[in-house]
Amino acid sequence: MRFLNKWKRLSDKENIQLIPYLENWIEKNPIHKIYIGCDSHNGPDKTTFATVIVLHYNTGGGHVLYSRETFPLIKDRHERLWKEVEFSVGTAMFLMENGLEKPDYIDVDLNPDPRYQSNSVLRAALGLIESIGIIPRYKTKSPWSISIADKACR
């Protein structure tokens, strides 16, 4: 699975080194939750993906890190949605492989209603996320990181 390696703080767009940054943040905030999500948008000739890591303080509020990457236009919706899942899962696996705790949730921009095209990817996505021991959330389950990723894509 692919992992994005150019990360920034959303608050000031400052580049960060992801693992040392997270280690420091977790040490200072031992009671917290971590959410990961990805969204994408198609432009006329390119597809932009934004993967976010939401660091949720136990007292409320959050701190957001993001990575944005652009690819040649991906016209196939299924392929684009699956790549969103891959970026989220790849990010979670990268964190765990580097000694960080397992994220609390991976949020996916997929709909449980079969009337929507994103539903075609939902079962496979949930299975993949659960197979690495992380709780998936999807539309109707309050996936915070997806709405943040949507804004980071633009």
PLM-predicted stretches and their roles:
Residues F71-K102:
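Acidic helix/loop or adjacent segment enriched in Glu/Asp that either coordinates divalent metal
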Residues T48-A50, P136-R154:
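C-terminal edge-of-domain segments
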Residues I36-G37, H41-L65:
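Acidic, metal-ligating active-site segments
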Residues D45-F49, P114-V121, I148-A149:
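A short acidic (Asp/Glu
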